[in-house]
Structures are given as C-alpha cells and as structure tokens.
C-alpha cells in the first residue's frame, strides 16, 4: 500500500504530481554515492559511469557512513529526497576492495542490491582512450554474451544483467533512428567451471560427496564479467548495406560478483505491475466480425422450462363453457335476475 501525502500548497501539489506513478514512467534517475572509505580507482569508475548516465544522474561528493547490506535507511532517505530509483554506492575496504554496489528502489524502499568487485589491474577509464567522446544522452545498444546470463533460475548473473539494462536504458521511445546507434555496451561472462559454479544466492553451493568444498576456493577464481564500450562507425561498402566498424571508447571494466540481496516477492510483483492505457482496445469474448463487417455474438444460456413460460392471454381466445359440453355455436342464455327484475336475454357465441 503506497502512502499518500497531502499537499499544503500549489507548489507542493505540482511536485507530488511530478513524482506520482504514470502510465509512461519518467526515465530512471541514478544517484552516485561514496562511503567513508573509497579508493581513487573506485571514484574514477563512478565518474565514468556518471558520464554515461548524464542528464539522468546525480552525484554526491561528500563521504557517507552507509553500509547498504546492514542498514539501508540512509539509502531510502536519499532516494526519496532526490527522487532516484537507481543508486551506485562506491566503497573500498580490506575485505572488499574497489566495490560498486548497484541498488534498485521501489516506492523509495530497497528492492534489490548486488555488489560488483572491480579489478584494478585491468581497469581503464574513458580519459585513457584517445577516441571521440560519446554524446550526452545517447542510448547504447547492449550485448550479453555467456551462458551464465541464460540461466532459467534467477541468480547473481541474471540480476546483474537486469540491473545493467536498467542502468543504460535511458528514455523510452517507440521509434529507433539508425543515426542514433553510435555505441554498444558488451558484457561478457566467462564460462563457469565445476569448481566455480554458484547457487541462486551468488554463493558457492555445499559440496557434493567426494568433492572439495567450493566455499574454500579463492574468490578470485569466480567467473568474471567483462564490460566493454565500443563506438560504431559506418563506411561505404559499395553495396546496399554499409560496412560497420567498431572502436573501443572506454571505460574498460572487469568485475566479480559479490553479495546480493534478492527482491521481496510481494514487492517485486507490485513493482512489475503495468497500468492499462485508455487507448488500449480490450478484447471482448464471444464477439467476432464476419466477411461483410457485421458483428456476430455468441451467448450461452441455460435450459428453459417451457411449462412455466408466461404467454399473453387474450379475452377473445378463451374457450366457452358450452363449447366444452359440445353445445351449438349460436345459442341464447337466459339470465335469471333477482326478484322484481325482468328477464334479460344475452346472445353468446361459442
């Protein structure tokens, strides 16, 4: 049940209407936060992601004493204060160095979270690539390669795919301009081995009989997510279709998935609801059109008891008493009147 806030003036009313649920939702705004300890590599990675999300992104520079998996109260406060449904929290410590935590919100409450551990050795920022920069507000194409993303059971990799799609989605549009397809984001997952297989919680499962405990394996042995960004250039090929070339634009990031928080089923069901538009034509059952354009309908009725059917009874259709006795058709009935009255004759036709 969503809470209702009563506006006090016209200005607050307009602000609430702007945040109210809509049939076509506004683009998701992403808020970038940093913890009390955040390495320079993590800050550079957040700056690169912020540059790719500009127009629909906000960034805080001050340190925040926040631990998302322990207490998410501050995240809910910042989400409601800034009207943000996506968050990227950067932190770094001895146990989990160079960590980016992606958070999705619904109704200003945490829906799900996932940790990405950045590899500092292979990371390259956008400034290290001597190529043309991506225009602000441009929507990318996305490619996910790897069997880990195709798992029928929700796990950390399927959640990572869903979060990255939400992160790079941008403004919704009905039409696609070919000239606007300027860059592509490619996310590749290494093939998991038997020793690095994970369960739905993103953690290693319990060992099978006769096998070593996978939980004792070094976290660096888990499958890697490789994120690459390429620019697209079309050149003449002498044929109808142009020749397409790609050039790496940056950033270049390699991640390992860490802790995750799965969404609550009831909250996820509420978040996935889609409102019906008034223009959407509703299909009516048992109604069709024939070749001439006439509307044909089918109705289903139960059995009717014809013995209790009420019909219209006319006075002229009533059967006479003498007709039942086999009398003549034309006869004269003598009606005895009371004492002192004359006898009256009435002609009755049977």
Curated annotation (Swiss-Prot):
Which PROSITE patterns has this protein been placed in?
BRIX
**Superkingdom, natural source:** Eukaryota
InterPro entries listed in its UniProt record: Brix, Rpf2
Q: Does the keyword Nucleus apply?
A: yes
Which key words are in the record? Nucleus
GO biological process assignments: maturation of LSU-rRNA from tricistronic rRNA transcript (SSU-rRNA, 5.8S rRNA, LSU-rRNA); ribosomal large subunit assembly
The UniProt record lists the Brix domain at 28-266
Q: Where is the composition biased (Polar residues)?
A: 192-202
Task: Please state where this protein is localized.
Answer: Nucleus, Nucleolus
Q: Which residues form a coiled coil?
A: none
Q: Does the keyword Nucleus apply?
A: yes
A single GO CC term, please?
A: nucleolus
Mention one GO molecular function.
rRNA binding
Where is the stretch described as Disordered?
192-219, 301-350
In terms of PANTHER family, this protein maps to: BRIX DOMAIN CONTAINING PROTEIN (PTHR12728), RIBOSOME PRODUCTION FACTOR 2 HOMOLOG (PTHR12728:SF0)
Q: Which family does it belong to?
A: Belongs to the RPF2 family.
Task: Relate the assembly described in the record.
Answer: Component of a hexameric 5S RNP precursor complex, composed of 5S RNA, RRS1, RPF2, RPL5, RPL11 and SYO1; this complex acts as a precursor for ribosome assembly.
Function, in words:
Involved in ribosomal large subunit assembly.
UniProt name for this protein: Ribosome production factor 2 homolog
Organism in which the protein naturally occurs = Chaetomium thermophilum (strain DSM 1495 / CBS 144.50 / IMI 039719)
